Amino acid sequence: MDPEDEGVAGVMSVGPPAARLQEPVTFRDVAVDFTQEEWGQLDPTQRILYRDVMLETFGHLLSIGPELPKPEVISQLEQGTELWVAERGTTQGCHPAWEPRSESQASRKEEGLPEEEPSHVTGREGFPTDAPYPTTLGKDRECQSQSLALKEQNNLKQLEFGLKEAPVQDQGYKTLRLRENCVLSSSPNPFPEISRGEYLYTYDSQITDSEHNSSLVSQQTGSPGKQPGENSDCHRDSSQAIPITELTKSQVQDKPYKCTDCGKSFNHNAHLTVHKRIHTGERPYMCKECGKAFSQNSSLVQHERIHTGDKPYKCAECGKSFCHSTHLTVHRRIHTGEKPYECQDCGRAFNQNSSLGRHKRTHTGEKPYTCSVCGKSFSRTTCLFLHLRTHTEERPYECNHCGKGFRHSSSLAQHQRKHAGEKPFECRQRLIFEQTPALTKHEWTEALGCDPPLSQDERTHRSDRPFKCNQCGKCFIQSSHLIRHQITHTREEQPHGRSRRREQSSSRNSHLVQHQHPNSRKSSAGGAKAGQPESRALALFDIQKIMQEKNPVHVIGVEEPSVGASMLFDIREST
C-alpha cells in the first residue's frame, strides 16, 4: 500500500448508523497537478498562489487527521524549487508521487461509492474546453444525501476541503472559492459547524471575512429541524467571488512581513524569506555544471543559460540574441540612440549607468582600485587586472602555433602575424615590416643614417639634460625646449609696435612663398640668409652649435639652411 494511503484523514458519512460508510480523503484527492506547458503559462504570482494553497491544504490535512508522510511535491514547494509534471497523453497525468485519478475512481466504484465526474471549464483561454481544468483543487464532488462526520475512533469533526477556482471575470484576476461542504460531528456534544464561503488566498496569508463567516454559520444552524448535512445546504454555492487584488490592497500598503535583522518590510512572506538569505548567506540553488550557488531559483535559471548557450531574448533590429532581458534592453539603445544617463558636470550622456560611473571618475580623479603589491591606483578594474599581470607574470594569451604566452591580446595578435606571414607595414622601398617601430627605425636609418629620436616617454625619463643655453647656462632635456628658451633672450632685440607686426607678416609671406615653390628653396633660403639680421643668424648658429656638440647626427648643416631653419626664423619673428 502506498505510504500516503496509510495516513489518511478518514471522513465518515453521517446518516443512519446502518448506512454509515467510510470514505477516506487522501492528499491526492485535494492536490493539483500541472503539465510543463500549463506550468509555463502561469505567471509568478499564480505560482506563489499555487504554492501557498498546496502548503495550506496539506497543513489542514495534518491538523484534522493522523500524521501524514510528507509528499515529494510538498518538499519541493517548501524549498521553492520549480515544479511541473510530464506532458499528458490521452489520459490525465499527475505528479509521480500521486496516483492517477482514474485509479482512484476505480477504487471508489469497487467500494460502491458514486463515481466522480471531472469538472469542465468553458471559455478558459489557453486550455481546451473539453479537458479537465488543470488547476482545480480536489475532486469536484457532488454532495450526497449523506453528510460527512468524523472517524468513529476519534469521534471528532473532520473537514473536507474542495477548493475550486472560479472563472476569471475582469482583467485576469483569479478568485479561489471554497466549496461549502458541510461538516458535522457525531459526538454527543457536536462541534460547531464550519463553513467558509469565500476562502481566498493571497501569497502567504489567508484572508477571511469574519462577518461573512458568521452569517454562513447562522444560516446553517438557524433551522432547528434541518440537519446541516442535507443536500439543500450542501448544494448552496458561493457566488460572491471577489478579485484577490481588491482584498490585498491594505496588505500591500501595510507590508506586515518585517525583517528582524535590518527592519525592511515586505508585502509577502515569500519575499521576506528570499531577503533573509542575504543576512544568512544561504544559497540553496546550486549549478550542477560549475557548482556555483545562488539565493534565488531565477538567478540559477539565468546562470544555466551560460552553460547551455540558450539566448531567448532576440533583437528585432539586428537579430542578435541575449541570455538576459536586461542585456537586450541595453542593446536596443544602440539602435534607438537613447542615452538616459547624463553627466551633470559636462553634459555627456551614456546608455549605461556603469559607463556614467566610470566617466565621473575623470572629473573627480578618483582611483578606487589599488594594487596590493605596489600601491598603484587605477580608475578601472580592467586596468588593475592588466597591471597585476606584471607582478604575477601571468600570460593568459597563448599562441596556438608556438605556445608563447602574452599578457595582452593585442600582443598576441601582433605575434600571430609572424606565423601567418602578414606584414602590414611597408616603406617607400617596398620593404615590409611587422610593426610600426621597426618601420620607423628603418626609415630613419635610410634617410639620415641614424636611429630615430627618443619617444616622448623616453625623453621625459632622461636623467641628463644635454641642451644648454650659452647665455644663461640653463640646461634642457629636449632641443625644442632650448629653442623656446633662446627666444626669450632675443625678444628685446625684436622691433616693437607696427614695425614688428609688418615684419611678422612679411616673414609669414616668405614662408608661404617657400612652400608654394619648393624648387626655389635654395635660392630663397640663400636670399633669406643674406638678408637676415645679424642677431638672427647668431642665434641660429648658437643653437646649431649646441646641437652639434650634443647630438651631431641629428643636426642640419648651417651652410645650407633648410625650410626648418626658415620656419625657426619665422617663429622667432612671430613671438
Swiss-Prot record:
Xref: InterPro entries: KRAB, KRAB_dom_sf, Znf_C2H2_sf, Znf_C2H2_type
Zn finger (C2H2-type) location: 257-279, 285-307, 313-335, 341-363, 369-391, 397-419, 467-489
Function: Transcriptional repressor. May modulate BMP and TGF-beta signal transduction, through its interaction with SMAD proteins.
Alphabetized Gene3D superfamilies for the sequence: 6.10.140.140, Classic Zinc Finger (3.30.160.60)
Family: Belongs to the krueppel C2H2-type zinc-finger protein family.
Keyword DNA-binding annotated: yes
GO MF terms, alphabetically ordered: DNA binding; DNA-binding transcription factor activity, RNA polymerase II-specific; RNA polymerase II cis-regulatory region sequence-specific DNA binding; zinc ion binding
PROSITE patterns (alphabetical): KRAB, ZINC_FINGER_C2H2_1, ZINC_FINGER_C2H2_2
GO annotation (BP), single: BMP signaling pathway
Disordered, as annotated region: 92-130, 210-237, 488-533
Name of the protein in its database record: Zinc finger protein 8
Extent of Basic and acidic residues compositional bias: 98-123
Record organism: Homo sapiens
Compartmental location: Nucleus
Cross-link (Glycyl lysine isopeptide (Lys-Gly) (interchain with G-Cter in SUMO2)), chain numbering: K174, K249, K441, K545
Keywords: DNA-binding, Isopeptide bond, Metal-binding, Nucleus, Repeat, Transcription, Transcription regulation, Ubl conjugation, Zinc, Zinc-finger
Tissue/organ expression: Ubiquitously present in many human cell lines of different embryological derivation.
SUBUNIT field: Interacts with SMAD1 (via MH1 and MH2 domains). Interacts with SMAD5. Interacts weakly with SMAD2. Interacts weakly with SMAD3 and SMAD4.
One GO CC term on file: nucleus
Domain KRAB: 25-96
